[in-house]
């Protein structure tokens, strides 16, 4: 017997003192792990059991049973969740005992497995077969010590109809030598089989749901069917659930993307090291340097930036949806340009796609022709873009200062604009709003593009319905004032010098007119700060809503080139609606003044750029424009290393003399910006609870807007 007396009689005969419970448990544990004589008996029993199972399978294959189920009647009531009734797996074969009738023993399901599945003293798996409920294995806990009350001996067995205390392991020697009677064992088997049969009936009586699921109506652990009906929930709950889903998806997606990028950087560096004949020490230094950069980048990504981390030096730009500030990071003292965008206005004005487009362009570009993005983040009210500060201002500032460029200066800037636009097109984007305001000058005098899809009044300036409505208002005013309508066809006639009509054959500028143009250009700058905007550089196909491609950016380039050589845009007018009218009739309104001389190549290039989309130069790629005679002699590969015509001279890193900061002081904030500033002050006074309440539904589209970049943030001049 394996009971308490058996252990004491064989193990503690020479010991004068009674062992404590812990020592008895340790001895029982060693028995379970194979250091006891009973292990050989268990192995012999299992081998005999396996042979009997093989014989039963052969008999079953030769002569099926009469009941038609292909197996013994003891398994007819097994629930379907425990396996197939008609073809049980070999793991469910009932063990047979020597000297007994060939009657199968109902065993518990395979979930009642042992805790230890391997013998520590050998590589033999001693639990490959399922034992009877009353039988032990080397992997089962033993009840041979006082510690047995704390052991989870038969919870799974009890779940399927077993008693509180199954047969003790001491019954095994009796089974081997035949001392245990058939009636005792069969009696235990019949009671266990009856219990399993009752639970099987309960399992089979579980009602089915209309969709095939089951509802849990008994103690058997079946699945419970739930019908999804989100419409019963409140709208706020549905929005919160959608927000959680988006945030979780964005979290894991960004984590996977960062892991992929990290692996790509490692693979690229290793391939570069293989192509160089460097020593192992130098290669290890390069790999170690990459590891340090990865650690630094990981720390920076975990750092949550906020507006409080930056000190505003000066406002250098304003718009309808936000502003641009010159800021200094408090902990490092580095200078950046911070672009802020109002979330509520982005949501109301349907600018969500444009917001994402700008961030994607800046994040996906490594080109020297695009403004560098270091970081992007957001709070309850604003989106923030931390970009490099270009102290040279923009091309509009240069045009206001010098009015007209020479052809050599124009050739340099137009060549760089071609390369910049080509870089954007290679990324798969269309700028659609190229104008002098969005062409920035860096500290070396070379240009970079900015404002990708987020220029002031972007949506409105591209909407033809907006201008048509303004034109109808003008006609109504003219009819009310007894003024004649504009003639339908061109030619001479009245209003030859009136810039508000389509009948202008040529604009002959006097000094007074040039002063008016300078005044117009300054008002044009103020117009850029408002919600009205200007369509001076927009291609006509954008207004038509008939589909357009990358060729629309080359129209804008032609309009800018015209302004650089002539002194004003080709379709400028005092009102945006009149500019729209001229653009839609560009074949009649595009004229070159007689008092300003330009070369034939320059005029030809402008005319071929300001043409119909299907005839426009550049529709098949930027090389068409590069090969034009106007750019003869331009070295396209090294132009960025060539000295620029104008290099800004700065007195300090925060010098903003090339930005219209004086004009911005007189430009009031837009109503939306003013309202947002008041709300921010109230939130700061009320504390964090009000800030949490401010998270409205417009936050949902901006999930994933936060961005950080490896190659920028690991450089010395980054954050």
UniProtKB/Swiss-Prot annotation:
Residues at which ATP binds: 316-324, 339
Region span, Disordered: 1-75, 100-219
UniProt GO molecular function: ATP binding; identical protein binding; protein serine kinase activity; protein serine/threonine kinase activity
PROSITE patterns: AGC_KINASE_CTER (PS51285), PROTEIN_KINASE_ATP (PS00107), PROTEIN_KINASE_DOM (PS50011), PROTEIN_KINASE_ST (PS00108)
Catalytic activity: L-seryl-[protein] + ATP = O-phospho-L-seryl-[protein] + ADP + H(+); L-threonyl-[protein] + ATP = O-phospho-L-threonyl-[protein] + ADP + H(+)
Record-level GO BP terms: budding cell apical bud growth; establishment or maintenance of actin cytoskeleton polarity; intracellular signal transduction; regulation of fungal-type cell wall organization; regulation of protein secretion; septum digestion after cytokinesis
Keyword line: ATP-binding, Kinase, Nucleotide-binding, Phosphoprotein, Serine/threonine-protein kinase, Transferase
Annotated ranges, domain AGC-kinase C-terminal: 632-717
Enzyme Commission (EC) number: 2.7.11.1
InterPro entries membership: AGC-kinase_C (IPR000961), Kinase-like_dom_sf (IPR011009), Prot_kinase_dom (IPR000719), Protein_kinase_ATP_BS (IPR017441), Rho-assoc_Ser/Thr_Kinase (IPR050839), Ser/Thr_kinase_AS (IPR008271)
Catalytic site positions: 433
Feature: compositional bias, Polar residues: 24-38, 112-130, 139-157, 181-219
Recorded family membership: Belongs to the protein kinase superfamily. STE Ser/Thr protein kinase family. COT1 subfamily.
Function recorded in the entry: Protein kinase that seems to play a role in the regulation of cell morphogenesis and proliferation.
Descriptive protein name: Serine/threonine-protein kinase CBK1
Native source organism of the sequence: Eremothecium gossypii (strain ATCC 10895 / CBS 109.51 / FGSC 9923 / NRRL Y-1056) (Yeast)
Organism taxonomic ancestry: Eukaryota, Fungi, Dikarya, Ascomycota, Saccharomycotina
